[in-house]
From Swiss-Prot:
One of its GO terms (biological process) is translation. Keywords: Ribonucleoprotein, Ribosomal protein, RNA-binding, rRNA-binding. The gene is rplJ. The keyword RNA-binding applies. SUPFAM superfamilies: Ribosomal protein L10-like. This is Large ribosomal subunit protein uL10. GO terms for cellular component: large ribosomal subunit. Belongs to the universal ribosomal protein uL10 family.
């Protein structure tokens, strides 16, 4: 009994420390395949095979009731502590290569996710790419603003220069 309580407490800690949680079914995968999957997401997540009943208890204690119906059969959870998009992409790619892995649902930013929504999360670009695009947009805007502010000044210089040339040619 104490072992089960410790497991529930550990699961609660994982739920607390995760930015997202992705629920999968791994029926039929070999130990080697599970090890490969764990390795592929280890930078951003902890992938744990879980007991359904204990996971339901821990999830419900954390206010996550969306897993109740999904926690059937052999279940494993990716507790994401990094980029949820990267983990969703890794799970999707692994599931394409190994159709026995099924992404069932998820929980992200206080909201339950369906399997389809986890797929949409995987379709997003990574945080780093989005930040780079945002920085590029800011940089382009700054260059545009600098050009806009410099345009009247350079136009005035060109006008004065043209007048000077006109006066010089008229004087000759």
């Amino acid at each position: 009994m104490a072992n089960k309580e410790a497991t529930v407490a550990e699961l609660e800690n994982l739920f607390d420390s995760s930015t997202a949680v992705l629920l999968t079914e791994y029926r039929g995968l070999t130990v080697a395949q599970l090890k490969t999957l764990r390795t592929s997401i280890s930078e951003h997540a902890t992938y744990a095979v879980v007991k359904n009943t204990l996971t339901k208890i821990a999830a419900n204690k954390k206010g996550i009731s969306s897993f109740d119906e999904e926690l059937v059969g052999p279940s494993a959870i990716a507790f994401v502590h990094g980029d949820p998009v990267a983990v969703a992409k890794s799970l999707r790619d692994f599931a394409k290569a190994n159709p026995l892995l099924v992404v069932k649902s998820g929980y992200f930013d206080g909201n339950p996710l369906t399997a389809e929504e986890v797929g949409k999360l995987a379709d997003l670009e990574s945080r780093e790419v989005l930040l780079a695009k945002l920085a590029g947009a800011f940089k382009a805007s700054l260059f545009g603003a600098a050009y806009l502010f410099n345009a009247p000044l350079s136009q005035a210089v060109r006008t004065v220069d043209a007048l000077r040339e006109k006066q010089e040619s008229a004087a000759e």
